[in-house]
Amino acid sequence: WPLISRELDRRRSRNYRGVLFADVRDTAFQSDPFGAMLTTQQIFYGFNGVESRTIGECGWNGGWIRDCFGEAKRRKLASKPIVCSGVSIATFEEGRLYAAQMAEVVSDAQFAPCERNGVDQGVHNVLMHENEVKHAVIVSQRTALVANLQAKVARVDPRSHKVANPRGDVVSVVHQYDRFPNLAAHYYETY
């Protein structure tokens, strides 16, 4: 996050319209996410992950928050939905500010003992649910143009390999496609 934050600061004067943060290992694009989502001047979109359980019901997400921010913070956020850190989309300035917030948290010496794989999602959830991210909107998997396939809400067409949300809208971004072996094989063959 410190490197991402510095890079966005460096590019601040280039008039970029938006920024997308994504896990590169398991994310694919079906269309331009910026055209569909960046329709206002200032916005930061976070997307729910698995919607069938809360932070408090999930050992991973609850554990990341507990280990990095303490049991009191985990209890405070226990009833909140899990917001996936695997894909976020924002107007440039909101994305730049978010990256700076993430960098500040993970660079703190007190954060070092809790650092491990996936812990950035705990930080992401704290920032989002504590209203620390300017102009943040949390979007449900049922209406999102980003599909988190771990949530098991999106539909994958077995013939076209297109992914759609429950409303039938073809999504712009597919995250965690490796949860569907046939879709992953299609992407590997295509790209």
Residue ranges and their predicted role:
Residues 76-189:
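Catalytic core and acceptor-binding pocket of nucleotide-sugar-dependent glycosyltransferases
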Residues 26-28, 68-72, 150-158:
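Short amphipathic alpha-helical surface micro-motifs
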Residues 61-79:
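Short, flexible, basic/aromatic active-site loop/helix in glycosyltransferases
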Residues 39-44, 68, 177-178:
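Compositionally biased, intrinsically disordered low-complexity segments enriched
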Residues 9, 73, 129:
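Short polybasic/polar patches that bind polyanions
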Residues 1-60, 86, 96:
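GT-A fold catalytic core of metal-dependent nucleotide-sugar glycosyltransferases
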